[in-house]
Amino acid sequence: MKPVKTITKHNWFLRLIKKIIRTVRVTPKLAFNQENLPEKAIYIANHSGAAGPLTLSVYFPKYLVPWGAYPMTENYFRRWKYLYYVFYRQKIGYGKIRSFFLATLFGIISKTLYNGVKLIPTYPDARLKTSIRKSIEHLEVNNSLLIFPEDSSGGYKEEIETFHSGFVFLANKYYQEKQVHIPIIPLFYHKAS
């Protein structure tokens, strides 16, 4: 496995996508304390449908390595199944035709996008240890993490109602191993902003 390196910018493909988005979209309001952003931190944010991760990746002034659903790092068919059945149908609430179309298109480019942002896959089982280890490696080279902790099994909400505690476990594990408190910083994005 390749060693984790400090990341200061996205690859050329993601920079191009970001430039296109910034050209056609009005800059949204992101709620966070812009003063004294730490060198490395765990940023937690609401997903806000499909828009949250993309918006934060494009407009946040710091490079963030996101946690994400593990099926999105697998082969095309598994990505498509996750996108169609879980992401678009269950979480976003789209109809069958729209979900099929979007899952088919996004399934094609998603692997390239997620590899470009160095997505750390998260798991609902013992493999989460791999996610924690990879996260600590990123923090050790001063890469900040972006985690969407909300429980989205009933769909995405504008405000987080309940959340998974993986980010707290990660912060505790980091402290146990490194004797350093890692800042946990909340971000908020509202797609109507």
Question: Each PLM stretch: what is its role?
Answer:
Residues 1-13:
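Helix-enriched interaction subdomains in cytosolic or periplasmic regions
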